[in-house]
Amino acid sequence: MTDQVGRVGSDLLATIVAATRHAVGERERGCPASELTSRAASVSPGGARFVAALTVRGRVNIIGECKRRSPSRGILRADYRPDRIAAAYEAHGAVAVSVLTEPTFFDGSLDDLRAVRAAVEIPVLRKDFIVTPYQLLEAVTAGADAVLLIVAALDDAELGALLDQATSFGLGALVEVHDAAELRRAVKAGAVVIGVNNRSLRTLAVDLDASRNLVGQLPPGTVGVAESGLRTSEDLMSLGAAGYKAFLIGEALMTTPEPGVALGRLLDGARSGDGDARVLARGVEAGGS
């Protein structure tokens, strides 16, 4: 994977999006959109429940992520069982679960999403590079309650159309931004849940100042979610005090021996006001982001 990322150069996102469009075309030839539309008609995603889960006052709202691999770190977990990980997240206080389904760069699949859906009651987010309506239908039929929409991967027309279509299917949408220009585009498109990714999808660099710099620009009525690079209870407390309603945490949990226990430690530290930077590190040798 390191060699693959090296060949991509400075714009990994463009490479992933191109690969995604090709892969989706292949899947659609095997299973037409009309067939998925028929299946989706009998499914009722919990999009409203997803949004509600992120906005409970007086609670630290964590979306725990299931992810086998990342382009920046390679394999995160050889013994990857997303259903068991998700169940552990739920047992230790996660309000939702994010599941990577992108196959080429993250080794994810819709089967992972289905397994998680069967294992938990809390809302499930399909995290992928959504660029076509077909992927929304896939998400619905696989059991997702919400999807990730990455502003940097879409033009304004695509973003608006996918957001509207997701809503019409009953899906929630976590609309991801990295800078002020992308935030303005998300707001213009009508995004309600806005995730600020501290990791640049073009360079993979992580900077928590992305979340700190943008929180003041989130309009009233939107739900801010801080993503990537969150490792300690202190991170959650400081960003929560700044105005974020929820936090999406992936690699920092996936690289611990017991991801659910690690999530519980973060929650306990944030609830008690223990901002010790070692709260999560006590359960991890490899580190994470």
Name each model feature, range by range:
Residues E138-E158, V196-L204, A242-L263:
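Glycine-rich phosphate-binding active-site loops on the catalytic face of alpha/beta enzymes
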Residues N213-Q217, G240, T255-G288:
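C-terminal helical cap(s) of enzyme catalytic domains, especially alpha/beta-barrels
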Residues T2-D79:
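An N-cap/entry alpha-helix motif that binds or orients negatively charged groups
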